[in-house]
Amino acid sequence: MTRTVMCRKYQEELPGLERPPYPGAKGQDIFDHVSAKAWADWQKHQTLLINEKRLNMMNADDRKYLQGEMDKFFSGEEYAKADGYVPPAE
């Protein structure tokens, strides 16, 4: 049976992640409140940010920036977008 969560991003009951994506309290919070769909959407957006803004994941400031953007993304706040990116038409 698929585990569901009340997704913080989409504000609806959706299938959850299979396991916490991070260790510790942050990973448990994501596991409990973020759907698999929202997590997959974040991973795509995160990749755009890393590439377009040339973030270095070995740099603590870049990791902190990305963590902040992830929090904004899931909470519904305004979050950074890749400059000039136009999503494909569906």
UniProtKB/Swiss-Prot annotation:
GO molecular function, a single term: iron ion binding
Domain of life, per lineage: Bacteria
Pfam families reported for this sequence: Iron_traffic
SUPFAM superfamilies membership: YggX-like
Coiled-coil stretches noted in the UniProt entry, renumbered to this chain: none
Keyword match Iron: yes
Keywords: Iron
Any one GO cellular component localisation term in the record: cytosol
InterPro entries the record matches: Fe_traffick_prot_YggX, Fe_traffick_prot_YggX_sf
GO process annotations (BP): cellular response to oxidative stress
Family statement: Belongs to the Fe(2+)-trafficking protein family.
Record's function text: Could be a mediator in iron transactions between iron acquisition and iron-requiring processes, such as synthesis and/or repair of Fe-S clusters in biosynthetic enzymes.
UniProt xrefs under PANTHER family: FE(2+)-TRAFFICKING PROTEIN-RELATED
HAMAP family: Fe_traffic_YggX
Protein's recorded name: Probable Fe(2+)-trafficking protein
